[in-house]
Amino acid sequence: MSRLFGTDGVRGLANGLLTAELALQLAQAAAVVLGHDRNSNGSRPRAVVARDPRASGEFIAAAVEAGLSSSGIDVYDAGVLPTPAAAYLVADLEADFGVMISASHNPAPDNGIKFFARGGQKLPDDVEDAIEAQMHNEAVRPIGPDVGRIQRFSDAEDRYVVHLLSTLPHRLEGLTVVLDCAHGAASGCSPQVFKDAGADVIVIGADPDGLNINDGVGSTHLGPLKEAVLQYGADLGIAHDGDADRCLAVDHEGNEVDGDQIMAVLAVALKEAGKLNDDVLVATVMSNLGLKIALRDAGISIRETAVGDRYVLESMREGGFNLGGEQSGHVIFSDHATTGDGLLTGLQLAAQVALTGKSLKDLAAVMTKLPQVLINVKGVDRTKVKSSDVLAQAVKAAEAALGETGRVLLRPSGTEPVVRVMVEAADEETAQSIAEHLAQVVRTELALELISE
């Protein structure tokens, strides 16, 4: 039987995989695993529950809150809120755990449930496994005064906004910023915090109706943001995804500024301020080689991890580093947050534009992105990537040809018969040529063997 929890909680089609019954069972199990200890004063354990504005979030939240409260957990219902805001509130309220109902950048029919431990930390695999195992046991059913209560938490958004403002190194007066909120969870608080920080704000993608989240807007569809930045002559644009745990940007000329470039700008700024722990940035193996070259020139090292913000977080915790992230725009400031925070990232980026007086285009020029070609080779035996001598020799020859001006990365899929071939080079033509050659070697050498009857 496959594992219920994926890389970011439980996610699937609402009323398909993710039913009200499953949400109730998950909550009952989490109540036992995460809220089994009463607080020191004898009070019931407490949990924060928040969601993005998907229509299905209402019934899933109701099921989660029923499962928690019927298991003896007091619930703070924070309503519609970004994922990083939910994590922050778990820590700020000293709650025992938190639940976020969202499918992030997925389309509206999907939804998901993920949990935060005390302090707003993501759960390790073994705790998720314990929750899944507990689902097969009898639910805990307290009676009388031991049942949990549900409290509507009306100032959740305001608390989060005050926290974000407290992190700013410089106010944003004089800046015009376009915000694309993806018709998602940040539709209320992102415009509010940028206005409170002093910026002139133009807002798009901030009219959620439960069905339009991520629909042609947000960080996965930057076209509308680019158009708005040019139309209004804005200094920059900021795009969130549905639950606002990521941020991509657009400069005043409409050029995309991705997660790697954002991290380069912020890492250099933190180092110059003496606030970048050990002068290290944590990034994944998929970050552009141009990031490593730029930061090396700035005296900053990169600690590489596997793809996924959970691996970035693990490395940051282990090494005591305070900045990390992914090319996709998940950026983590561990001095201020326990997870990727698109609002925090956007504010910090805008603050650098205001503080330095430079355009975002000029700031992002600290890094030169190398052309990157990615080919997904399907229908191959992904388990043989490291055992094929012919493939190893082909990779070695490609790396020798690229020298220090490029790199090769082969990544087998974790679930499908697919191998991803990624090549970076000084020019697009070279990257494409080498990637296509290696993809052909993968097709030939890792071809799936046909089983004859």
Curated annotation (Swiss-Prot):
Textual note on the cofactor: Binds 1 Mg(2+) ion per subunit.
Gene Ontology terms: biological process: carbohydrate metabolic process; peptidoglycan biosynthetic process; UDP-N-acetylglucosamine biosynthetic process
Post-translational modification: Activated by phosphorylation.
Residues of the signal peptide: none
Disulfide bonds: none
Database matches in Gene3D superfamilies: Alpha-D-Glucose-1,6-Bisphosphate, subunit A, domain 3, Alpha-D-phosphohexomutase, C-terminal domain
Catalytic activity entry: alpha-D-glucosamine 1-phosphate = D-glucosamine 6-phosphate
Matching InterPro entries: A-D-PHexomutase_a/b/a-I, A-D-PHexomutase_a/b/a-I/II/III, A-D-PHexomutase_a/b/a-II, A-D-PHexomutase_a/b/a-III, A-D-PHexomutase_C, A-D-PHexomutase_C_sf, A-D-PHexomutase_CS, Alpha-D-phosphohexomutase_SF
Enzyme class: isomerase
An MF annotation (GO) of this entry: phosphomannomutase activity
Reported cofactor(s): Mg(2+)
Entry binding sites for Mg(2+): 104, 241, 243, 245
A GO CC term attached to the entry: cytosol
Keyword set, alphabetical order: Isomerase, Magnesium, Metal-binding, Phosphoprotein
Active site: 104 (phosphoserine intermediate)
EC number: 5.4.2.10
CDD domains tied to this protein: GlmM (cd05802)
Residue positions where Phosphoserine is found in the record: 104
Family note: Belongs to the phosphohexose mutase family.
Main function: Catalyzes the conversion of glucosamine-6-phosphate to glucosamine-1-phosphate.
Protein's recorded name: Phosphoglucosamine mutase
Protein's organism: Pseudarthrobacter chlorophenolicus (strain ATCC 700700 / DSM 12829 / CIP 107037 / JCM 12360 / KCTC 9906 / NCIMB 13794 / A6)
Gene name of this polypeptide: glmM
